[in-house]
């Protein structure tokens, strides 16, 4: 959702207070609070990388509130012309950030600079783990690592500003990170590599589920979950899950 938030800040030139970081668990509460705050003057509500429930949609429609949804989770498909649920785009997996970017560009809220295209593509490859090359995997891992270091709010503000710089031709494609960030990312990845490599067939429990050889990994720190899974399956292809 951070990529979508950066696009909202940049594309709509809006204030941070108008962008909310929601999960399926707190979405209804946030929408309810904004409906109470704005009354009959609630502006168009945009949902990206998260889909409102049928109950939320019913409340918005009852109040006559305009809304749009940009999501790539097929399980969230709901009957409404305002909802764009796409798992694929141009023949490959897509994500909420890419769907939102396409709409913003088509409606002239932003122009698709090379920097913007690279930023969105890195997020897409990471979000759906669709890596076309080792280089693509590395770029995605670096951006995700910076996200972990900065946290969602700082990451969003930093890249909303960089998108603005790129729009003014003050930042080029490939200039995703500054020198300090590159050093911080490198140090963090070194530390993460030690954790990831510590998981081997000898250190995990193995069970068979519906004919699939499955590794049960206990990660007490709760970090790098996707990377541990991805690296483990790549190193030990005899496992299915």
Model features per residue range: what roles?
Residues 150-151:
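Eukaryote-specific, cytoplasm-facing alpha-helical/coiled-coil scaffolding segments in long proteins
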Residues 154-191:
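Long, charge-rich alpha-helical interaction segments
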């Amino acid at each position: 959702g951070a990529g979508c938030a950066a696009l909202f800040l940049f594309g709509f030139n809006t204030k941070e207070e108008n962008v909310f970081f929601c999960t399926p668990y707190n979405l209804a509460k946030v929408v309810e609070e904004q409906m109470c705050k704005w009354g009959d003057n609630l502006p168009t509500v945009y949902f990206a990388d998260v889909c409102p429930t049928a109950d939320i949609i019913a409340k918005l429609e009852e109040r006559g509130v305009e809304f749009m949804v940009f999501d790539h989770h097929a399980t969230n498909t709901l009957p409404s012309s305002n909802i764009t649920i796409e798992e694929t785009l141009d023949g490959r997996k897509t994500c909420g950030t890419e769907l939102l970017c396409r709409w913003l560009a088509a409606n002239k809220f932003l122009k698709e600079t090379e920097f913007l295209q690279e930023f969105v593509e890195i997020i897409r490859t990471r979000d759906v783990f669709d890596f076309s090359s080792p280089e693509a995997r590395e770029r995605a891992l670096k951006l995700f690592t910076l996200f972990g270091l900065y946290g969602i709010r700082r990451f969003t503000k930093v890249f909303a500003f960089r998108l603005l710089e790129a729009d003014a031709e003050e930042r080029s494609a490939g200039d995703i990170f500054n020198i300090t960030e590159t050093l911080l990312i490198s140090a963090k990845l070194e530390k993460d590599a030690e954790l990831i490599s510590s998981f081997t067939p000898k250190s995990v429990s193995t069970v068979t589920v519906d004919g699939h050889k499955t590794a049960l990994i206990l990660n007490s720190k709760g970090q790098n979950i996707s990377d541990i899974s991805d690296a483990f399956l790549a190193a030990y292809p005899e496992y299915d899950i």
